[in-house]
C-alpha cells in the first residue's frame, strides 16, 4: 500500500517536471491568445453549419447557452452577451471575411496540435491531406454531431419516462451529470485524435476522466473566488469580465495540457518514469532487436519494442534511429519499419562509441541488472575504462595547465 502511494506521488512529480520541461504554461498562454481570436470564428462556423439544416434551427443558441451554463463559471454571462453580438455581426461578412474566420479557426487547431506534438515528442506534424481531413472533420462534423446530440437529449428529456409521473429512478441524476460525461467524451476524443501518433484509447479515456473532473473542480473554485473575493472589480470596474474570462481560458488550457501529459506519461513504464536507461544501453538493446529481426527476415517498429516490454519513448526512438541512419546502420522500409543495412560483423563497438553523440554513462548511472546477455561484460568493461580514465586524468586542472605552460616555456 505504501509503495503504491509512493509510486503515485513519484508519478505526479514526474508529470509536473515533464509539464514544466515542455513549457506547459507558455503553451497555455499561446493557446489563450489564439482562442481569444478563434472563439468567434468557431461559434460562427458552428451556427452556420447548424442553421443550414432546418431540423437544427435554433439549436446553435441552445448549445451556446448550455455551454456557458455548464462549462464556464458564473462570470460568463457578460462575455456571452459580447460573443453573441460579435457572432451576429460576423454572419454578415462577405466570402472573404468568412475565409478569414475559417483561417483563424484553423490556426487555433494548428496551435493545439503543435502543443500536443511537443508533449508526445512528435517531430513531424500532420501534412497535406491527413491534416486537411482532420481539421475539416472537426469544423464540419463537430457542429453537426453537437447539434444532433443536443437535439436528441432535448427530445429524450421531454419524454414521460423522465419528466412525467412515471419517471424512471436515476434518469434525472443522469441528466445532471451529462455535462461531465460530455466533457469526458470530448477530452478523450481530443487526446486520442489530435496527436500525430498512436495513443491507446484506454489511456485517452483515463486522461479524459481526469481532465473532466479537474476541469469541473476548477470551475467551482473559480466561481467561489469570483463570488467571495470581488476585489478585482475595484481594479477593472465594468471591464472585469474580460480579464476574468481570459484567466479562465488560461486555466482551462493548463488543465487540458496537463491532462495530455498524463495520457502521454501512462505509456511510459515505471523504469522510464524513474530513471531512463543510458543511451548506450538503449542503442545496444535496439541493435539486438534489429539483428534478431534481420535473422527472421522482418522489420522493426516501435510497437514491437513496446510488446517486448521495452517502453522506449518515441522521441528517444527517433533520436537513436536518426543516429543509426546517419551511420548507415539502418534503413527505413516503405511501410515505416526499420531494418539493418550493414553487416554487424564488420562494425565494432569501438566504432559505435567513437561516433556516439551522447556521453558515456557514469558508473552510478548503470543499473545493477539488465536482462541482456551482453550487459555483465559491458558493465565490467565500462568500469575498467572509467578507472583507467580516472588514473590518466585524475590530476587537478591547475596541475595540467601548469604542466602545459612549462612545456611551452621550454
From Swiss-Prot:
InterPro entries: UPF0761_bac (IPR023679), Virul_fac_BrkB (IPR017039). The chain crosses the membrane at residues 36-56, 93-113, 132-152, 167-187, 204-224, 238-258. The keyword Kinase does not apply. It is a multi-pass membrane protein. It comes from the Bacteria. Signal peptide: none annotated. GO terms for cellular component: plasma membrane. It is found in: Cell inner membrane. Its main location: membrane. Keywords: Cell inner membrane, Cell membrane, Membrane, Transmembrane, Transmembrane helix. The keyword Membrane applies. Belongs to the UPF0761 family. PANTHER family: INNER MEMBRANE PROTEIN YHJD, UPF0761 MEMBRANE PROTEIN YIHY. This is UPF0761 membrane protein PST_2825. It comes from Stutzerimonas stutzeri (strain A1501) (Pseudomonas stutzeri).
Amino acid at each position: 500500500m505504501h509503495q503504491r502511494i509512493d509510486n503515485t506521488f513519484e508519478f505526479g512529480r514526474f508529470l509536473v517536471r515533464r509539464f514544466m520541461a515542455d513549457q506547459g504554461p507558455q503553451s497555455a498562454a499561446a493557446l489563450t491568445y489564439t482562442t481569444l481570436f478563434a472563439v468567434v470564428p468557431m461559434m460562427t462556423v458552428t451556427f452556420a453549419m447548424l442553421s443550414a439544416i432546418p431540423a437544427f434551427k435554433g439549436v446553435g443558441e441552445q448549445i451556446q447557452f448550455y455551454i456557458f451554463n455548464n462549462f464556464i463559471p458564473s462570470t460568463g454571462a457578460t462575455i456571452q452577451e459580447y460573443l453573441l453580438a460579435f457572432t451576429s455581426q460576423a454572419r454578415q461578412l462577405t466570402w472573404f471575411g468568412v475565409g478569414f474566420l475559417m483561417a483563424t479557426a484553423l490556426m487555433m487547431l494548428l496551435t493545439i496540435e503543435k502543443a500536443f506534438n511537443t508533449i508526445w515528442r512528435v517531430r513531424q506534424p500532420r501534412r497535406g491531406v491527413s491534416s486537411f481531413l482532420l481539421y475539416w472533420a472537426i469544423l464540419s462534423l463537430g457542429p453537426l454531431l453537437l447539434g444532433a446530440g443536443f437535439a436528441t437529449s432535448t427530445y429524450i428529456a421531454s419524454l414521460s419516462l423522465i419528466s412525467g409521473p412515471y419517471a424512471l429512478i436515476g434518469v434525472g441524476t443522469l441528466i445532471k451529470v451529462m455535462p461531465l460525461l460530455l466533457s469526458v467524451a470530448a477530452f478523450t476524443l481530443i487526446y486520442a485524435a489530435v496527436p500525430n501518433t498512436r495513443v491507446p484509447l484506454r489511456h485517452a479515456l483515463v486522461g479524459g476522466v481526469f481532465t473532466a473532473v479537474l476541469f469541473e473542480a476548477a470551475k467551482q473554485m473559480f466561481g467561489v473566488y469570483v463570488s467571495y473575493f470581488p476585489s478585482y472589480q475595484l481594479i477593472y470596474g465594468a471591464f472585469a469580465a474580460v480579464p476574468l474570462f481570459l484567466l479562465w481560458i488560461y486555466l482551462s488550457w493548463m488543465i487540458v495540457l496537463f491532462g495530455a501529459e498524463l495520457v502521454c506519461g501512462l505509456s511510459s513504464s515505471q523504469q522510464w518514469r524513474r530513471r531512463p536507461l543510458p543511451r548506450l544501453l538503449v542503442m545496444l538493446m535496439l541493435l539486438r532487436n534489429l539483428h534478431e529481426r534481420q535473422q527472421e527476415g522482418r522489420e522493426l517498429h516501435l510497437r514491437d519494442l513496446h510488446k517486448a516490454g521495452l517502453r522506449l519513448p518515441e522521441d528517444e526512438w527517433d533520436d537513436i534511429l536518426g543516429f543509426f541512419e546517419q551511420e548507415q546502420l539502418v534503413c527505413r522500409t516503405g511501410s515505416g519499419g526499420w531494418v539493418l543495412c550493414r553487416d554487424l560483423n564488420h562494425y565494432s563497438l569501438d566504432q559505435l562509441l567513437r561516433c556516439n553523440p551522447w556521453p558515456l554513462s557514469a558508473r552510478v548511472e548503470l543499473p545493477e541488472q539488465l536482462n541482456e546477455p551482453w550487459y555483465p561484460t559491458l558493465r565490467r568493461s565500462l568500469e575498467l575504462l572509467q578507472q583507467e580514465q580516472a588514473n590518466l586524468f585524475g590530476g587537478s586542472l591547475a596541475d595540467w595547465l601548469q604542466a602545459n605552460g612549462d612545456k611551452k616555456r621550454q
